[in-house]
Amino acid sequence: MKNLDKGTVIRTVLLFVALVNQTLIMFGKSRLPISEDQVNTLADALYLAGSTIFTIVTTLVAWFKNNYVTSKGKLQKETLKQKGLTK
């Protein structure tokens, strides 16, 4: 147990809690007071947050990759202009 990192211990404990909860639900006894509406609300919020983060990151990466914003990029643009390969 001394060789396990904190993340492994946390994931193992959460897995155990989830398995116990699922077993109790199978026998008709819910131990975690979580309603289906709460789960749906959380899922919707996580989806919205994930979509927003994905859109922002993708937009920034595409903008950075498609524009000459670094000094190296500006040199590349000048080289392309000199060789007639860009507008």
Swiss-Prot record:
The chain crosses the membrane at residues 44-64. Keywords: Membrane, Transmembrane, Transmembrane helix. Signal peptide: none annotated. It is found in: Membrane. It comes from the Bacteria. It is a single-pass membrane protein. GO terms for cellular component: membrane. Belongs to the SPP1 holin family. This is Uncharacterized 9.7 kDa protein in cwlL 5'region. It comes from Bacillus licheniformis. The gene is xpaF2.
